[in-house]
Regions:
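Short, charged, intrinsically disordered terminal tails
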Residues: 52-60
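Non-DNA-binding regulatory cores of transcription-related proteins
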Residues: 1-53
C-alpha cells in the first residue's frame, strides 16, 4: 500500500473535511491537500496510511 489516502466528498465540503482530518490525525500525517471535492492525505508511513484508511472507512 502507498502512503496516500484520497477522500472524495460532496462539492464544497473538502476544505472542512481536510481541516478536521488534519486536526484529528496530525501524528499520522505528513500533509493534507484538498480542493473543492477531494482530500489527499499523505501519511508519514505506509502503516499510518493503512490505519487511517481503515478508520475513515469505519465512519461510513
Amino acid at each position: 500500500m502507498e502512503k496516500y489516502v484520497v477522500l472524495r466528498t460532496i462539492p464544497g465540503n473538502a476544505a472542512e473535511c481536510g481541516s478536521l482530518i488534519e486536526k484529528n490525525y496530525q501524528e499520522k500525517l505528513f500533509a493534507v491537500i484538498n480542493d473543492d471535492d477531494s482530500v489527499l492525505m499523505i501519511a508519514r508511513t505506509e502503516e499510518a496510511a493503512e490505519k487511517l484508511h481503515k478508520e475513515l472507512l469505519s465512519y461510513l
